[in-house]
Amino acid sequence: DTNGDIRWVLKPDAFTNYDFRNLDRRGNMMAVTQVKDGDLIFAQGLRHFKMDLVGLVKRDQRLPRGYIDYSHDQIQMPNGDLLLRVGKRNYKRPDGVVVNTIRDQIIEVNADGDLVDEWNLPEILDPLRDNLLRALDQGAVCIEIDPKKAGQTAEARPDAPLMDIPGIEVGRNWAHVNSIEYDPKDDSIILSIRHQGVIKIGRDKQVKWILGTPAGWSAKFKDKVLKPVDSHGKALT
């Protein structure tokens, strides 16, 4: 609390059975958030939960069919629906290759766990853009931290294995959404995408603006990149 005193503790056994083959019970609880009614929402693996402060689980729901690998963030919208960051199973790319996607899908689910809407980032953005990927410090932010690679940047090879590694194209970690925000003023979502930038996307799945380097964006997105100005509206360079 505000005095620094412990008021509440969740014992790990409540959501962990120590069978690390079971993604739903590994104990990898993420995005623990207190919502308007005082309860906590969080997710792990293929399930998302709601629990009150005395430990009563009020919701234990599986992701909608076809979606996998929840992690990082979920938020509750003003209407009570949830926005979840997930991947998609058996996704068919335009070249015909079928993959499991990595951290590049946002879904809206209702109180029954049913799918309401989807933001399919490979179709909305450009999974081949590699400008931020190539600037990554592999010793600091990649999945398997290796201090020996500190200062080395990622390669983003088009022939890299299809797996959870930084790389271009769907089936690799080309996006890496870290957080979601919702803007009720225009029914849009704002995503912090580690490998692309901070991007606002409308309900119509159109990009409203991009906060980040202008490098590498195609003509479709160039006018969406925000330009820095000072307090007088003068462009900063």
What are these regions (language model features)?
Residues 1-237:
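Histidine-/acidic-rich catalytic cores in large beta-rich domains
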